[in-house]
Each structure stands twice: as C-alpha cells, then as structure tokens.
Amino acid sequence: MMYLCDLYNNVPVIKVNEVKAIGCGAKNLYEIEEASYVAISAGTGTACVACNDNVFSHLGGISVGGGTLLGLSNLITNINSADKLDKMALEGNRKNLDALIGEVVNDIGSLYPDITASNFVKSVDNTSHSNEDILASLSNMIGEVIGTISYLNALLMNVDKVYFVGRVTLLESVKKGIDKRLSLANISGIYKENREFGNALGAIAYAKENN
C-alpha cells in the first residue's frame, strides 16, 4: 500500500480525510446553508457523506460507479472512452434490453410502469443488440444504483435533496438514471458546474479552515 509522504520537496503535506473533503467540498461548491445535508461523491465508486452542524460522517458507500461503467463497457463493447460511451448511450434504447414494470405487472404501489423491473433481462432470449442499446442499459443501471443508495441515505437523514460531487454525473446517460431513481422517493439531485472537482476543492477549503 502506498502512503502520501509528509514532505514533498521539503514542503509540508497537509492531509485531509476523504469524508471531510467530500462534505466540505459540497458545502463550499453549493454554498450550502442548511445545518444538515447529504453529499454524494460519485466517481470511480460512490460514497455518501452526511453533515450535521459541521460534523461530517460517512454514511456508507458502494463499489459501483464510473469505474464499473467504464470497465464493463470495455469488456462488453470495447469502448473505454467516457465521452463516446455517453454519446452512444444517449442514442440507444435501453427498453430493448431492460424489462419495465409495466411489461411485467403494471403498477406496483407508487412505482410507475416505466420503472425498470430487471436490467438486461431481455438479453437472455436475444443476444443480438447494438452497442448503443447495451450502453444505454448499462449507463442507466449504474445511474439507478447510484440513485438508489443516494435516496436511501437522504431518507435516513430526513433531507429532501442530495448534493453531487464527482465526475460520473457529467455523463448525461448516467445522470438520467440517477434522477429517475431519486424521483421515486421525491428526492432532488442537485448538480453544479465544476462538481467534478468537488473533492479537491473540499480538501483545499478544509485545510485552509483548519491549519
């Protein structure tokens, strides 16, 4: 395991805990004034951070994120460019691969017919699909997973919105999946320009405030 040294070219290195960097990054980027909020760092994986009166805590995380998306995309379609992947996903139709609730059982409670019942299930009977459709389904699935863990933690903390940092939500195909899943719990996803730098900005801000 590699560790960051305490000195670099005789300059002291200030180390900031990632949880604090995520929470502080969201607070500064979005100029959050609420005493309690939830920040979601959606990057290679996904981490959820809560803030209560400037105390940051790690709610949990999952290994599914942008790394998963690019890895599976490369394995299945030989495409490992995020921009190309996103463009193709937006051109595809995930309904050619995914089964929707309306196709299976109609409405279930508050779940409307267009919600996914099973990702990729239609490939069981038909393996001939375009890369665009595959990437549309894959991007949506990653978005649904991120959206689900986001709204569950929002409900846990009794907030009605989550603030995103990290690069994955720059991919519109993933962001659409996140927002559809958040809407199931009436949770709003908040996105701001430069959110891909949120963790780095948070580390800088936290270091300035505490040193």
Predicted feature residues:
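Glycine-rich phosphate-binding loops at beta-strand->alpha-helix junctions
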Residues: M1-Y3, L152-L155, V159-R181, R195-E196
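A short acidic Gly-Thr/Ser loop motif
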Residues: I40-G45, S63-G66, R167-V168
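Glycine-rich phosphate-binding loop plus the immediately following alpha-helix
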Residues: N54-G109
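N-terminal glycine/serine-rich phosphate-binding loop of ATP-dependent small-molecule kinases
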Residues: M1-A21, L182-N186, I190
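Glycine-rich phosphate-binding/hydrolytic loop that grips phosphoryl groups
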Residues: G23-Y30, L69-S73, S81, S183, ...
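Non-catalytic structural scaffold of enzyme domains
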Residues: Y8, E31-E33, F56, T68, ...
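Conserved phosphate-binding catalytic cores of ATP/NTP-utilizing and phosphoryl-transfer enzymes
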Residues: P12-I40, G45-N54, L201-A207
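Adenine-nucleotide phosphate-binding core of ATP-dependent small-molecule kinases
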Residues: L111-K161, E196
